[in-house]
Amino acid sequence: MSTTGRHHPLYVAQTRVFVSSSRYGTKDISAITIEVNMYENIGLPYITGRLIIIDSANASNAVHFQGQERVTIIVLDSEANPIMNKEFICVGIDFSQKVGDDKSGFSVKLIEEHVLLSNSTRFSKVYEGKPDAICNQICSEQLGVSVTPEGSPTQSDMRVVFPFTTSPLEAANWMAARCTNANGIPFYFYSTMDDNNLQLKDISNLLGQGAFNADDPYIFGTTSNKGAGQEEDWDILSKKITNYTINNNEDTLLAMARNVFGGYYNFIDTYEYGGEEIKYQLTDPLETLPKPNGSTTYNYDPAFTTGRPYHEGQNTYTSQVVTRKLFDDKFSFLEEDTVDKHLNKSKSRAIYAFMDQQPINVTVPGISFGFDKLGQQMDVYIQKDIPPEEKSNIESVRDKKRSGTYLVQKVMYTIFNNRLTATVTATKTSTDPSLGAEQLNQN
């Protein structure tokens, strides 16, 4: 990629891309890489990437991508300081096209190395300990990457036997999914751009943190104060939302299918208490989550009824046969000593699905956003549509439903011509208590 000398909130100074392989030395392909994309997802323990290359320098022969090369991406700020340095493994070329008599374009897929190691590894081993410790031990031993925990799972020490058909990341995901706090709230297991360790974090802790841009939100609306012939103020540019979309969300039928609101469970203990039926209700774990801005609940109305509230219904009937005392001295993977502790599995799955009920996508300047915001909360201000003749101020035009605090769940970083943008998928975690007093505009 080219070098820019602009000290601008939207641009990086340089983006350097290097490729290395045991077949040849390190090669700098920055000049022919026209676009870099990197993808974070709070639900995945790995990061993926993509390079768009316009080849007019014989790169396809000189570099000869085969899906095994090591790719290093370095982003430098205006002072030539590295603000991001990430290493990937090339996993192939997903398309190639001739774009002229003397050049062609192709897209190179990238992924973190520990994913390739996991996919090429099958192991069988017995582990003992709490599920978060076992998750870390698997990743450290099998993949060479550590897991940084935040929060303390309530599950007891257990003994887990993994069969030889299991890959390391599959086993680690099992253990991460087994982690809940005492209220049944699950943990996210994911990878971030700014830390080589994997993360395992209690959702309650993530929701309890303040927004990294508190009182200085990203803004979608009329934000410019520039005069004629002037450039837009850089402070405004650094927090301006350039694109805002809402995907399919708040899907009640899908939530029901996922047992988000309620469910009927039968845990059959083969050791002592036999079968015991118990109802799961969404209101129970919701009551334990942090609620900012004076909210009384998250985006669910427990009083709504067309016969009965959703959480009092049962969308499915689930039976699980659970042993106890499979081992004399420790629990096995699925064992608990009470039905209430078994119910944490149901609460965990429901809250995990509930977190996807109200996402939005916003595109913001990548320089101000940085590479360390996955799993953090951000403040967003969305301007609502108003009639042009209506008098307004910054508070009256605020969209109270869409403005507020969001948890960053996915980020796509795009670098094109050294312009860095971050497209963020985030879920609303705060509700304005005055929202219910809003009136329809009948004019």
In which residue ranges do the predicted regions lie?
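Short, cationic low-complexity segments
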Residues: D77, P131-Q137, E141, G221-L237, ...
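Charged, gly/pro-rich, cysteine-poor intrinsically disordered low-complexity regions
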Residues: N225-L374
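Short beta-strand-centered interaction patches in the first periplasmic/extracellular domains
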Residues: G105, E112-H114, G151-A257, I268, ...
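A broad structural signal for short, well-ordered beta-strand segments within beta-sheet-rich domains
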Residues: V12, T26-N37, C90-G92, D157-R159, ...
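Surface-exposed cap/loop segments at beta↔alpha junctions
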Residues: A59-E150, R159-V161, A176, D202-S204, ...
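Active-site-proximal structural scaffolding
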Residues: P131, F164-P168, A182, S191-M193, ...
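Juxtamembrane "anchor/assembly" segments of surface/extracellular structural proteins
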Residues: M1-I74, F106-L117, E150, T306-N443
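Short amphipathic beta-strand/extended segments with alternating polar/hydrophobic composition
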Residues: R23-E35, I83-V91, T121, G210-S224
